[in-house]
């Protein structure tokens, strides 16, 4: 029983570990992946997934398809169901209804053959304090690879990929935060998973570490891993994901590439105007214009989403002048994922 509990804990920790190796931007090349090639079917297929926590509906008939080689983003606010969906896919949670297939095969708790092909990077970092860096990596790798000689080679590769040479005999408490993240990643990728789940991997890290994490994910993807990436950081998802899904309240609201999602909601250019003071009545007048889909005012900036971009700018400026609102710089910006999220859900997803 103790071994079973340890294995369960290790699977979860493997998630966070992958984060760390990602911090080693510009490090050694990601090792090539092992495992049978995927045979033309979706690597992840979820249909009609329902998960309840008492009266709370965490997943509401959730559907998902992820193809081999993608970096697929699950985008949504905290509580949108991203982590719940991943935990159901990994069989860490039971669910009330629906089906899950990974690698074209039904996923069940007993499918250890499928679990060996998966890596998990949870939001919270977790390693064994009593083990050294190398022992931690070897422990988690041993859950998937029994041959000691093969495992020794895999651990060597993971140490190099994570930039942990010289730290192999250190215990986690002696490592800096960045090195600890590298250890987490090394443990998660040592067995060379074909499918890797990253759950909010850049929460509470500095910008430099965040960039390194993203570069590490790119390296893994170039080496052949399919990546499932959850985040509520818009810029991150826009930068790294080849395709993404917008989630809210346990539902999949829209799926596509960045460009497809913007086209889906006709998220044209945003007009922005520096306005030191702007009365609520003027804002309501702008919202009443037929071509204005959205008007927000905050921090001295008026932000407008217009159906025709800047073509109706004259009408906007006329409203400002009618209310005696002094304005300065006027400029247009391309739409962002936050604009798409706002159009689809009616709320903003702020970093």
Regions inferred by a protein language model and the residue ranges of each:
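Conserved ABC ATPase "signature" region
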Residues: 138, 142, 149-167
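Catalytic Walker B motif of ABC-type/P-loop ATPase nucleotide-binding domains
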Residues: 196-200
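Conserved catalytic motifs of ABC-family nucleotide-binding domains
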Residues: 192
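Conserved ABC transporter NBD signature motif
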Residues: 98-106, 114
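ABC transporter nucleotide-binding domain
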Residues: 214-307
């Amino acid at each position: 029983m103790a071994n079973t509990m340890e294995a369960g804990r290790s699977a979860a920790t493997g998630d966070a570990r992958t984060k760390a190796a990602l911090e080693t931007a510009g490090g050694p090349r990601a090792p090539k992946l092992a495992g049978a090639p995927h045979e033309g079917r979706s690597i992840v297929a979820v249909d009609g997934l329902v998960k309840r926590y008492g009266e709370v509906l965490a997943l509401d008939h959730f559907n998902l398809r992820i193809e081999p080689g993608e970096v697929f983003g699950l985008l949504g606010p905290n509580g949108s169901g991203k982590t719940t969906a991943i935990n159901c896919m990994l069989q860490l949670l039971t669910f009330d209804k629906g089906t899950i297939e990974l690698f074209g095969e039904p996923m069940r708790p007993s499918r250890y053959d499928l679990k060996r092909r998966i890596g998990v990077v949870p939001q919270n970092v977790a390693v064994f304090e009593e083990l050294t860096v190398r022992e931690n990596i070897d422990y988690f790798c041993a859950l998937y690879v029994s041959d000691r000689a093969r495992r020794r080679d895999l651990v060597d590769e993971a140490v190099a990929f994570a930039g942990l040479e010289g730290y192999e005999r250190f215990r986690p408490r002696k490592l800096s935060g960045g090195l600890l993240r590298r250890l987490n990643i090394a443990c998660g990728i040592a067995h060379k998973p074909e499918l890797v789940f990253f759950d909010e991997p850049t929460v509470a890290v500095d910008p430099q570490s965040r960039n390194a994490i993203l570069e590490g994910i790119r390296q893994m993807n170039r080496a052949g891993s399919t990546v499932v990436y959850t985040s509520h950081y818009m810029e991150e998802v826009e930068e790294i994901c080849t395709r993404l899904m917008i989630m809210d309240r346990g539902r999949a609201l829209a799926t596509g590439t960045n460009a497809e999602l913007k086209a889906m909601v006709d998220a044209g250019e945003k007009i922005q105007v520096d306005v030191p003071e702007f009365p609520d009545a003027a804002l309501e007048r702008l919202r009443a214009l037929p071509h204005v889909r959205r008007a927000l005012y905050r921090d001295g900036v008026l932000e407008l989403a217009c159906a025709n971009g800047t073509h109706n700018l004259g009408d906007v400026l006329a409203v400002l002048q009618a209310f005696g609102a002094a304005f300065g710089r006027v400029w247009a910006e391309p739409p962002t994922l936050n604009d798409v999220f706002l159009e689809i859900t009616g709320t903003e997803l702020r970093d």
